[in-house]
């Protein structure tokens, strides 16, 4: 049957509508790659993630038996060699850092707030609270406020991280406070967790990674 101009136009509109609906349902720019469609290098990386400590943390992005892996790992798959190198860095920063877990997660939340990284905040908020961060401190931070009621260590971490993100340098006072409390290794590990999660924030924001289960974005816009 010959398709007339009007019908052709209608079909085009339907197609465009369907494409828009699909995009709305899955806003990811880097679409999920099922295990069955991964290259050998991608599969090796994905298997390594699933065999690592991320799974035990309860990450929704790394679930044994799932059809694929989620963000940011799904994005890293596009560059398997980079992905494998970042995996070692990420596992050190998450699980082997010299900083106490609560403070490490607090620094991640500071980074997520600065970058408006909804997925990153969603993933690490529960980990920070589980590690002992006061929910009121997290709530104030989410609202773009300097949290009231921080203990001495939290204040040191916040001051250093906030200065680093907002001014791109740190004052002598902020630096000295970190080194005096956590040593030079602690200072380097604190720089590293802030820096690595800037990368993660960039990955997630560029990808437009959706929150699991259609969760509401936890971070309000900053004024």
Task: Give a label for each model feature.
Residues 1-5:
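Sec-dependent N-terminal signal peptides
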Residues 10-99, 222-223:
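Mobile cap/lid helix-loop segments that border enzyme active or cofactor-binding sites
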Residues 83-87, 107-123, 188-205:
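N-terminal hydrophobic signal/anchor transmembrane helix of membrane proteins
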Residues 99-140:
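Mid-length scaffold segments of soluble, non-membrane domains
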Residues 131-160:
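A contiguous pocket-lining binding segment that forms or flanks enzyme active sites
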Residues 151-191:
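Acidic/histidine-rich alpha-helical segments that form the ligand environment
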Residues 178-179, 195, 203-223:
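Acidic, carboxylate-rich catalytic segments that either coordinate divalent cations
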């Amino acid at each position: 049957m010959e398709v007339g101009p009007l019908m052709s136009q209608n079909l085009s509109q339907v197609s465009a509508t369907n494409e828009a609906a699909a995009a709305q349902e899955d806003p990811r720019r880097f679409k999920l790659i099922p295990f069955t469609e991964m290259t050998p290098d991608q599969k090796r990386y994905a298997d390594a993630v699933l065999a690592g400590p991320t799974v035990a943390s309860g990450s929704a992005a790394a679930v044994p038996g799932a059809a694929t892996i989620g963000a940011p790992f799904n994005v890293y798959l596009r560059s398997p060699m980079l992905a494998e190198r970042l995996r070692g860095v990420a596992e050190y920063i998450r699980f082997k850092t010299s900083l106490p877990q609560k403070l490490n997660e607090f620094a991640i939340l500071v980074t997520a707030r600065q970058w408006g990284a909804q997925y990153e905040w969603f993933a690490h908020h529960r980990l920070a609270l589980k590690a002992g961060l006061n929910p009121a401190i997290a709530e104030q931070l989410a609202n773009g406020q300097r949290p009231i009621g921080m203990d001495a260590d939290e204040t040191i971490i916040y001051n250093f991280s906030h200065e680093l993100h907002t001014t791109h340098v740190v004052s002598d006072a902020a630096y000295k406070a970190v080194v005096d409390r956590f040593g030079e290794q602690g200072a380097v590990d604190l720089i590293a967790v802030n820096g690595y999660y800037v990368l993660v924030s960039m990955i997630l924001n560029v990808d437009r990674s959706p929150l699991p289960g259609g969760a509401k974005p936890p971070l309000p816009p900053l004024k």
